[in-house]
């Protein structure tokens, strides 16, 4: 396993922002292996559907084989003819064609995406969770400083 360069890959997902912290990714590929539909590809870091608000893949599909379900962009395989227009429209390169379109469905039937559960470093996460953790850490630091200051008198 290798450590890759550190940067954030961000994409807006309706109300939330999905974050892949590439600097935290250790290249273990658990996210890729755990995906039940093989919707994550790995090329130095995980590439997965960001379930864009504007979802260009949905509008590019002439067969209406892509739908938004539970705020996730999902391929309906029975409708897909494998034309590849969705893959061309995807700004993240997260769709591949293997007879039909294959992409992350955001584990739309689950509360938490499997890739997020299995990631040992938390490299795949929601920005909201990351910010809440940072805020809590900052509050804890200020509380410690206040305690030290108050007890120094």
Curated annotation (Swiss-Prot):
Name of one Pfam family that matches: Fer4_11
Binding site for [4Fe-4S] cluster 2: 35, 104, 107, 115
Cofactor(s) essential for the protein: [4Fe-4S] cluster
InterPro entries with a match to the protein in the record: 4Fe4S_Fe-S-bd, 4Fe4S_Fe_S_CS, RnfB_subfamily
Protein residues bound to [4Fe-4S] cluster 4: 61, 80, 83, 86
Ligand binding ([4Fe-4S] cluster 1): 25, 28, 31, 119
Record text on cofactor binding: Binds 4 [4Fe-4S] clusters.
GO molecular function: 4 iron, 4 sulfur cluster binding; metal ion binding; oxidoreductase activity
Keywords: 4Fe-4S, Electron transport, Iron, Iron-sulfur, Metal-binding, Repeat, Transport
Domain 4Fe-4S ferredoxin-type: 16-45, 40-71, 71-100, 95-129
Residues that hold [4Fe-4S] cluster 3 according to the record: 49, 52, 57, 90
UniProt protein name: Uncharacterized protein MJ0264
Record organism: Methanocaldococcus jannaschii (strain ATCC 43067 / DSM 2661 / JAL-1 / JCM 10045 / NBRC 100440) (Methanococcus jannaschii)
Lineage of the species this protein comes from: Archaea, Methanobacteriati, Methanobacteriota, Methanomada group, Methanococci
